[in-house]
UniProtKB/Swiss-Prot annotation:
Chain location of the short sequence motif Microbody targeting signal per the record: 15-23
Coiled coil: none
Pfam families registered for this protein in UniProt: AMP-binding
Cofactors that this protein relies on: Mg(2+)
Top-level taxonomy: Eukaryota, Viridiplantae, Streptophyta, Embryophyta, Tracheophyta
Propeptide residue intervals: 1-38
Keyword ATP-binding part of the UniProt annotation: yes
Species this protein is from: Arabidopsis thaliana (Mouse-ear cress)
Reaction equation(s) it catalyzes: a long-chain fatty acid + ATP + CoA = a long-chain fatty acyl-CoA + AMP + diphosphate; tetradecanoate + ATP + CoA = tetradecanoyl-CoA + AMP + diphosphate; hexadecanoate + ATP + CoA = hexadecanoyl-CoA + AMP + diphosphate; (9Z)-octadecenoate + ATP + CoA = (9Z)-octadecenoyl-CoA + AMP + diphosphate
Metabolic or biological pathway: Lipid metabolism; fatty acid metabolism
Name under which the protein is recorded: Long chain acyl-CoA synthetase 6, peroxisomal
Tissue distribution of the protein: Expressed in roots, stems, leaves flowers and germinating seedling. Preferentially expressed in seeds and senescent leaves.
């Protein structure tokens, strides 16, 4: 045997040993870990993720894994490897936290609101058994799909636990869905039983005759005597939640525990384009994701969590799996976002998960209050903020006097006890994250994920004070960036490699339900999920999201546009509440539709001496439009937008983009085809104006 074959054999043995080895106790002990300059500089002392050695790579791009588990992707909780399914997870909680508070609500049976009343883990376990037994009693076969069509409340989680313990597949439906979307999902997933509330019952009944798979409708809450009775010829029974519980108690059934690879849920993506897709997630997928997240996200049985983000979304769903594992108490909001602050004051949570939209509102509200207070109060806030910010940057504790004088009043807005804040679903600006850390004093972390990865792909590590990134890979997956030459993103880019984020590991969904074609479009032959997001690696192995591939379009001269990136830049303008950027291959310029902040608009108009007229007239005022566009240009230059990325015309509207007017998904992302249609007249008029001012500006060459 020559030296080259001997060397090759030794390398092969090293690769096999590395791949099959368990979690190493110290990354320094492994000679296989190397700094790789082409993949972003890092060192082992403060590296949050590591690059696999070249010979371990799959394909041409560097593969990153969490430094917490570099050679073995996590698939189970390290402390409880016996937990393999959602049923196992809940059984663990019922056993270990039986008498601990679990589900709390302020809403009474008659609809009034009072103090939080609690159900223990043990009581929830009993209700779960009764509910699952009730479904079996009604002849719903094991493996059937069960729809959940109402907002967050204790019964939502009990239904979900019952599905897990009796091998049903839960199919969450956003309460904001209309009859057409409900009909599509119910028929597509062949839902046999569906849980709803009085508010969603009518929407359901209006299309029940067109949903032949449904055999049982269970109404949560409300009065039993008000339930409609359907003709026996319909083949559908309508019962109340309480009646189903009693039927289950009278006819108890043993558990039918699922296997790890059994389907746990089909989550229908909200869909910014076209028809919703059913994301199929197994018990193993969900347990792996949450187990990986538990390496850096630590809850305690003394924690209190408020649930108000939609449980139909994977972000809140994963949070609930994690709260069960740690035995956390979960209090629910009343169901009205306008009353959320009242619920926070009553519950006083220690853990708060939200989305940038709410954090931005908190930030803007406090900053505006500080500026309008003026004088001594404003100077005191600025002194306190700068002192505490500097202390945090230096890794030190700030003087408690600043909390007593300034920040405790701000903390009280969220109940006064929040120690841990998480943000997801869309990017949180570095300024807002810094603000939350300083003002609330606890840990603030941002994550990145998607339904197709069972939630978290990456998250910020504890002790990492750098903002503007989404942290290191979840220990349950590996990440690589793939070149996107048409957008000029490559792994050879300096100073940081850039490309489309691709993910692989036990967190990856099994596919889109009944849609093999679209499944193959996003998962390649090597098992890599192509996310459509563009990222780069920062020093330390931190991932930063910089662009979006899926929503890109071309302008007339061939420039590629990523509208979400531009919209996020313009969101920093003082006038802008929301922004929709539009362009196409027939025009050489971008145009913008801006939902204005009415308070800022009124204040600015008064300061500029623009008198008379209502807000709608202000939106149509050429002077106002010019001021807004000028402010957008200023922010765009600060963000170093390229020339063709600037909006050349703007339409101002008072109406916000909402779920109700069909312009937003339930996760507050713009539905682009719908927005294009909704603002079609405004878009046409803007291009006419641009064409009149410069006939060559909006025609292809």
């Amino acid at each position: 045997m020559d030296s080259s074959s001997s060397s090759s054999s030794a390398a092969a043995r090293r690769r096999i040993n590395a791949i099959h080895s368990h979690l190493v106790t110290s990354s320094r002990s492994s000679p296989l870990l190397r700094s790789n300059p082409t993949a972003g500089e890092f060192c082992l002392d403060n590296g949050y993720s590591v690059v696999l050695p070249e010979k371990l790579n799959t394909g041409s791009w560097n593969v990153y894994r969490s430094a917490k588990s570099p050679f073995k992707l996590v698939s189970r909780f390290p402390d409880h490897p016996d937990i393999a399914t959602l049923h196992d997870n809940f059984e663990h909680a019922v056993h270990d936290f039986r008498d601990y508070k679990y589900l709390g609500t302020r809403v009474r049976v008659d609809g009034t609101v009072g103090d939080y009343k609690w159900m223990t883990y043990g009581e929830a376990g009993t209700a779960r058994t009764a509910l699952g037994s009730g479904l079996v009693h009604h002849g719903i076969p094991m493996g059937s799909s069960v729809g959940i069509y109402f907002i967050n409340r204790p019964e939502w989680l009990i239904v979900d636990h019952a599905c897990s313990s009796y091998s049903y597949v839960s199919v969450p439906l956003y309460d904001t869905l209309g009859p057409d979307a409900v009909k599509f999902i119910v028929n597509h997933a062949t839902v046999q039983a569906i849980f709803c509330v009085a508010e969603t019952l009518n929407s359901l009944l209006s299309c029940l005759s067109e949903m032949p798979s449904v055999r049982l409708v269970v109404v949560v809450g409300g009065l039993i005597e008000s339930l409609p009775s359907l003709p026996s010829s319909s083949g559908v029974k309508v019962v109340s939640y309480s009646v189903l519980l009693n039927q289950g108690r009278s006819n108890p059934q043993r558990f039918f525990p699922p296997k790890p690879d059994d389907v746990a849920t089909i989550c229908y993506t909200s869909g910014t384009t076209g028809t919703p897709k059913g994301v199929v997630l197994t018990h193993a997928n969900l347990i792996a994701n949450v187990a990986g997240s538990s390496f850096s996200v630590k809850f305690f049985s003394s924690d209190v969590y408020i649930s108000y983000l939609p449980l139909a979304h994977i972000y809140e769903r994963a949070n609930q799996i994690l709260t069960v594992y740690f035995g956390v108490a979960v209090g629910f909001y009343q169901g009205d976002n306008m009353k959320l602050l009242d619920d926070l004051a009553a519950l006083r949570p220690t853990v708060f998960s939200s989305v940038p939209r709410l954090y931005n509102r908190i930030y803007a509200g406090i900053i505006n209050a500080v500026k309008t207070s003026g004088g001594l109060k404003e100077r005191l806030f600025n002194a306190a903020y700068n002192a505490k910010k500097q202390a945090l940057l230096n890794g030190k504790s700030a003087s408690p006097i600043w909390d007593r004088l300034v920040f405790n009043k701000i903390k009280d807005r969220l109940g006064g006890r929040v120690r841990f804040m998480t943000s997801g679903a869309s990017p949180l600006s570095p300024e807002v994250m810094e603000f939350l850390k300083v003002c609330f004093g606890g840990r603030v972390t941002e994550g990145y994920g998607m339904t197709e990865t069972s939630c978290v792909i990456s998250g910020m590590d504890e002790g990492d004070n750098l903002t503007g990134h989404v942290g290191s890979p979840n220990p349950a997956c590996e990440v690589k960036l793939v070149d996107v030459p048409e957008m000029n993103y490559t792994s050879a880019d300096q100073p940081h490699p850039r490309g489309e984020i691709c993910v692989r590991g036990p967190i990856i969904f099994t596919g889109y339900y009944k849609d093999e074609i679209q499944t193959k479009e996003v998962i390649d032959e090597d098992g890599w999920l192509h996310t459509g997001d563009i990222g780069l690696w920062l020093p330390g192995g931190r991932l930063k999201i910089i662009d979006r591939k899926k929503n890109i379009f071309k302008l007339a001269q061939g420039e590629y546009i990523a509208p979400e990136k531009i919209e996020n830049v313009y969101a920093k303008c003082k006038f802008v509440g929301q922004c929709f950027i539009y362009g196409d291959s027939f025009n050489s310029s971008l145009v913008a539709v801006v939902s204005v902040d009415p308070d800022v608009l009124k204040s600015w108009a008064a300061s500029e001496g623009i008198k008379g007229g209502d807000l709608r007239e202000l939106c149509n005022n050429p002077r106002v439009k010019a001021a807004v566009l000028s402010d957008m240009d200023t922010v765009g230059r600060e963000a170093q937008l390229r020339g063709f990325e600037f909006a050349k015309a703007v339409t101002l509207v008072l109406e916000p983009f909402t779920l109700e007017n069909g312009l937003l998904t339930p996760t507050f992302k713009i539905k682009r085809p719908q927005a294009k249609e909704y603002f079609a007249e405004a878009i046409t008029n803007m291009y006419k104006e641009l064409g009149a001012s410069d006939p060559s500006a909006n025609r292809g060459l």
